[in-house]
Amino acid sequence: MSPSDAAPALDGSRAVRAWLFAVAGLIFVMVIVGGATRLTESGLSITQWQPVTGVIPPLSQADWAAEFARYRQIPQFSALNADMTLEGFKTIFYWEWSHRLLARVIGAAFILPALWFWRSGRFKGPLGRQIAVATGLLALEPIVGWWMVSSGLAERIEVAQERLALHLLIGAATFGALIYAAVGLGERPRESASAGFVAAAGALAALIFCQLGLGALVAGLRAGLIDNTWPLMEGRLIPGGVFGLAPWPRSIVDDATTAQFDHRFIAYAVVASTLALAIAARRRAPRSSLARRGAVLAALAILQTALGIVTLVMVVPIEFALAHQAVALLLFGMAVVNWRATAMERRTVTAR
């Protein structure tokens, strides 16, 4: 390939890379808006799934009255919001409507450029498979989202926590898949990253991903509203009743005390793992990009844990809860960057 041929190809990769990062950024915003929707108890305000016509909010007083009437028919209204006015309903409606509107924006921002890049032959080899995975996840997410919402429309006053966790994890997986693909289109320095570092980076990303799911279970079970002390729970390191349901794995999903206990101790494991990775990388190559990524990961993990503690002891103020969720996604994204970049650096050295 001549230099003149290489330049357009490189420019094309840069365009695809920028697009992938941009969509990942939109998903980041989407997750934060989703968190605000949950924290404001707004997620059940729209009781119908209308993928096309739902883009337009109620425009007349009659439309608003009809929408409010539908909300008044579900259990959440009588249990939590029996004194809600139409103006109050509009507030929670717009949170959920904004969340769904952003989902549609993300769909368009992904699908339309993807079709153009595909027709231009930009999705070759592993990148094509990565885009296919991201497409599947994006298509699945709204289906799971409605499945989650529907769980709170009949017998419950909130959505099922396991469906909430799945909804968040699919969003996080899509976010991670886009970042993984985007980092793979960049150039990496020639640094000696051992197979052990690659495996450790992948394991860390998986651990943080699991921690995101545990955080969603804490949110769905309202477990942040109990045991608002730190570092002990109920005055003990291991509180009574942990894993007390039968069979015991049910406690992970259905018991608030167990959910908070799990989330706390996996947080400690994440901090310890990031610190160990940062120290090992610095000892191996102090000035390497691996060492810098390790330092960023450790700093984010410590910040995230501190935000979690503050959120807990202050009994979940919305601003700290949203910051906690935002940094969690940043930490996961950085872990994916580190995993992909470390693997690429190892291949670069091996290929020399």
Task: Kindly label every feature range from the protein language model.
Residues 1-352:
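Polytopic transmembrane helical bundles with strong interfacial aromatic enrichment
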